[in-house]
Amino acid sequence: MPDRAAKLQRQFGQAVRTERKAHQLTQQQLAFEAQLSLTYIGEIERGQRMVSLDTLQRLAGAFKLTAADLLAKAKI
């Protein structure tokens, strides 16, 4: 199970990075929009942190997506 969780974290982080770049946002801008720390955004994008449902909602909202849409982009 830990390997699967790590894979999901990486997939989600890559999706967040892809969406951020598609929206032409810096990590700092995304952190501001999602009301999260810059460090936390970096850790998510590197696949080092599992996000909570609240964080998922905040990130999706910053991209003007639903949480389900953001998860779908991560192929989760």
Label for each model-derived stretch:
Residues 48-58:
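Short, basic-rich loop-to-helix N-cap that marks the start of a DNA-contacting helix
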Residues 56-60, 70-71:
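Hydrophobic micro-packing sites on short alpha-helices
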